[in-house]
């Protein structure tokens, strides 16, 4: 009787083991792919920047021209030492352009010397995707800089002759996927 019970226990143990381990198996040959997120570019934020920190701005009018999101050229006289303009573009390709113009105003030359410094740039581009993600795709590490310190007696000539030859337009072109295709100073 002991032999029959031992045989029955062994068969029962094998049957339970087979049933349990077969039920817990998984399929290692199938790989589960994570869902692919498709995000598309919905817009880009372009940031223009102008900085003119010195006293040359007291005797000059600084006029900035830039391209708006709708492609129209806008311009205006700057009243402060720093100017930042952000536009959101949704039509691609788009060429962002900034240009400076300096004109002598009616103010008297009261200082003994003048510092003319202007930094201007298409400073940064941030791509905005359909899922709300924002990625900075471009930052201008070297804004256009023009400047000179001159005595008051030569300030008039410098404004009339030197500024026009040094002021160049800066442009960048954004492709249909929001990438910066080229950067140009002309």
Residue ranges and their predicted role:
Residues 97-186:
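Extracytoplasmic electrostatic interaction patches
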């Amino acid at each position: 009787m002991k032999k029959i019970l031992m045989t029955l226990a062994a068969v029962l143990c094998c049957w339970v083991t087979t049933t349990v381990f077969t039920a817990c198996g998984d399929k290692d040959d199938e790989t589960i792919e994570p869902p692919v997120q498709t995000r598309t570019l919905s817009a880009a934020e372009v940031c223009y920047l102008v900085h003119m920190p010195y006293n040359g701005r007291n005797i000059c009018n600084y006029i900035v021209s830039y391209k708006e999101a709708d492609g129209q050229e806008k311009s205006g006289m700057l009243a402060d030492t720093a100017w930042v303009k952000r536009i959101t573009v949704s039509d691609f390709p788009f060429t962002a352009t900034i240009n400076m113009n300096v004109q002598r105003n009616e103010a008297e030359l009261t200082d003994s010397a003048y510092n003319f410094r202007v930094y201007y740039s298409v400073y940064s581009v941030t791509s905005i995707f359909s899922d709300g993600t924002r990625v900075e795709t471009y930052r201008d590490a070297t804004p256009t800089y023009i400047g000179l310190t001159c005595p008051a007696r030569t300030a008039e000539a410098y404004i009339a002759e030197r500024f026009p030859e040094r002021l160049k337009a800066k442009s960048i072109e954004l492709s249909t996927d929001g990438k910066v295709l080229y950067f140009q100073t002309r």
